[in-house]
């Protein structure tokens, strides 16, 4: 409970100030970004946190989660509102699968969109996707943010 307290108190305060219908939160269970290890009880932490946040009636919960389908299903069962789900590294042929299955109301594609400035055109034309380069994330320069090629660049 103590590990979840800040997130719950912050979400509660924001919802009270601007309205729960204008408040959302993003969680990244099982993220190992920058060597984070949330410990053996992290699944229980997220179950508790999502159940508490659900009671606030927030606009949506945004989960970024690469694996552990059982945990995703558990969190979905605890969250009655809108769910935005991001699956980093998800293959293109699985885009839309979480919506089609009813697991999520919306899917997000952060890293894929970042690496493909013409993302919509690539989807519409079934064009190839640029792979994202995580080594450029948060690097302090424009490398990795504005230098990915478009389909037109590749054709030239």
Give the ranges of each region predicted by the language model.
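Flavin-dependent oxidoreductase catalytic cores
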Residues: 1-156
